[in-house]
From Swiss-Prot:
GO terms for molecular function: dCTP deaminase activity; nucleotide binding. It comes from Aeromonas hydrophila subsp. hydrophila (strain ATCC 7966 / DSM 30187 / BCRC 13018 / CCUG 14551 / JCM 1027 / KCTC 2358 / NCIMB 9240 / NCTC 8049). It is an enzyme of class 3 (hydrolase). Homotrimer. It comes from the Bacteria. Its EC number is 3.5.4.13. GO terms for biological process: dUMP biosynthetic process; dUTP biosynthetic process; nucleobase-containing small molecule interconversion. Keywords: Hydrolase, Nucleotide metabolism, Nucleotide-binding. This is dCTP deaminase. Belongs to the dCTP deaminase family. Catalyzes the deamination of dCTP to dUTP. The lineage of its organism: Bacteria, Pseudomonadati, Pseudomonadota, Gammaproteobacteria, Aeromonadales. It catalyses: dCTP + H2O + H(+) = dUTP + NH4(+). Pathway: Pyrimidine metabolism; dUMP biosynthesis; dUMP from dCTP (dUTP route): step 1/2. InterPro entries: dCTP_deaminase, dUTPase-like_sf, dUTPase_trimeric.
Length: 193
């Protein structure tokens, strides 16, 4: 069952869902909560590795990822990060989100941004039960013009579903959870699979 606005507000009031800083009532509508863009970004450095072998030895994957990913880029409030056509970049939400073991979250991009070519999540839009941390955004500019992205702009919306029961293996209890408590634009850790 997807939570409606009044259920989302109740879960926030009761501390079952935690969003910090807590969004104002104007950002909760129908079935979702608007989330804002954070200040941290990472980009892919072109031509620093010939390829990444996604099924190769984990040490080679880790080395290739380290070569192609930039250090974290901090964009101050009021300034912009420019995402160029065909560019993939990582960023994070401004808010940190914590979910209990019986709720799953879903991140949706904004239609108004998609109509300009911005994909907010390339594929990964599920926020697992037991998740706690900021949400990494996988931006792609499929449009024809560079897009200026500014910290604290509305970037997407979260909605929540109750599970049929409490998850036996929520994210925060899994020993192999690669992105547990992430706070920045964390690069891929596929080498830890």
């Amino acid at each position: 069952m997807r939570l409606c606005d009044t259920d989302i507000e109740r879960h926030l009031d009761e501390g079952k869902i935690v969003i910090e800083p807590r969004p104002g009532i104007e950002r909760i509508s129908g079935v979702s909560v608007d989330v804002l863009l954070g200040n941290e970004f990472r980009v892919f450095r072109d031509h620093t590795a010939p390829y990444i072998d996604l099924s190769g030895p984990s040490s080679e994957m880790a080395d290739a990822i380290d070569r192609v990913m930039s250090d974290e880029i901090h964009v101050p409030d009021g300034e912009a990060f420019y995402l160029h056509p065909g560019q993939l970049a990582l960023a994070v939400t401004y808010e940190s989100v914590t979910l209990p073991a019986d709720i799953v979250g879903w991140l949706d991009g904004r239609s108004s941004l998609a109509r300009l070519g911005l994909m907010v999540h390339v594929t990964a839009h599920r926020i697992d039960p037991g998740w706690s941390g900021r949400i990494v955004l996988e931006f792609y500019n499929g449009g024809k013009l560079p897009l200026a992205l500014r910290p604290k702009m509305k970037i997407g919306a979260l909605n929540f579903e109750m599970l049929s029961g409490v998850a036996a293996r929520p994210y925060n209890k899994r020993e192999n959870a690669k992105y547990k408590s992430q706070q920045g634009a964390v690069a891929s850790r596929i080498n830890q699979d």
